[in-house]
């Protein structure tokens, strides 16, 4: 059973902590959460000329302020709950077992409402977020005769890589002539079946075949010359 001196000592601690929290809220305007982000918080009139990455520090500080404000609000709520329990004469009684909470525990944690063995256990999860898991067991299936995956990890990477990567010609063992050739398997056909479909076109009626000069067309001609043929789908005999 808590003595009057012990109870008064704990009450004074709770009231002083409550006063400190309210003063902090007043001094820092609730961690500046009442200020508009990002303009009022870091003085910029506009964010149009700033890359989103340039606001990473400000965003991190904003997120931290939100977490600190939430922590202080929860602490303040626990303090008010304990002060109300003192008024009701139930302070120092475990809300689970109904037994008295030792003074030593209350002195260390004045907002304690249960015995140590009944306190909530905050277990930190060791599970990693789903985006860190490997989406496929194998990166590509091109070399596997038994598996013909229509869409594998390589395709996923290429879909993202088309928006750009950090590679430069100096990083390559055989530097390409064009930045368009920096991507993985840049020479493979995309959106067509035959390699010549990259540089030919027809009009709306399917007639008037046009050949466009391009790197793909040059490579196609070189391959035909190396093989000594005129087409990849069967040789053509000149009249």
UniProtKB/Swiss-Prot annotation:
A zinc finger (dksA C4-type) spans 94-114. Residues 133-158 have a biased composition (Acidic residues). It comes from the Bacteria. The keyword Metal-binding applies. GO terms for molecular function: zinc ion binding. SUPFAM superfamilies: DnaK suppressor protein DksA, alpha-hairpin domain (SSF109635). Residues 133-182 are annotated as: Disordered. Keywords: Metal-binding, Zinc, Zinc-finger. Pfam families: zf-dskA_traR. This is Uncharacterized protein YteA.
């Amino acid at each position: 059973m808590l003595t009057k001196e012990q109870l008064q000592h704990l009450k004074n601690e709770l009231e002083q902590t409550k006063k400190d929290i309210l003063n902090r809220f007043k001094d820092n305007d609730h961690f500046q959460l009442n200020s508009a982000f990002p303009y009022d918080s870091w003085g910029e009139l506009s964010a149009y000329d700033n890359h989103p990455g340039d606001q990473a520090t400000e965003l991190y500080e904003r997120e931290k302020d939100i977490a600190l404000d939430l922590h202080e609000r929860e602490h303040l709520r626990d303090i008010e709950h304990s002060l109300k329990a003192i008024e009701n004469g139930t302070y120092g009684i475990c809300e689970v077992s109904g037994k008295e909470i030792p003074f030593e525990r209350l002195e260390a944690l004045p907002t304690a409402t249960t015995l140590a063995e009944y306190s909530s256990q905050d277990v930190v999860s060791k599970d990693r977020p789903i985006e860190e898991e490997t989406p496929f067991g194998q990166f590509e299936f091109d070399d596997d005769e038994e598996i013909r995956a229509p869409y594998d990890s390589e395709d996923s990477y290429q879909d993202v890589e088309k928006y750009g990567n950090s590679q430069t010609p100096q990083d390559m063992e055989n530097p390409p002539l064009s930045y368009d050739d920096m991507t993985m398997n840049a020479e493979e056909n995309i959106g067509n079946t035959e390699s010549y479909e990259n540089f030919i076109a027809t009009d709306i009626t399917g007639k008037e075949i046009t050949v466009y000069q391009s790197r793909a067309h040059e490579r196609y001609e070189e391959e035909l010359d190396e093989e000594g043929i005129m087409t990849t789908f069967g040789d053509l005999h000149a009249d």
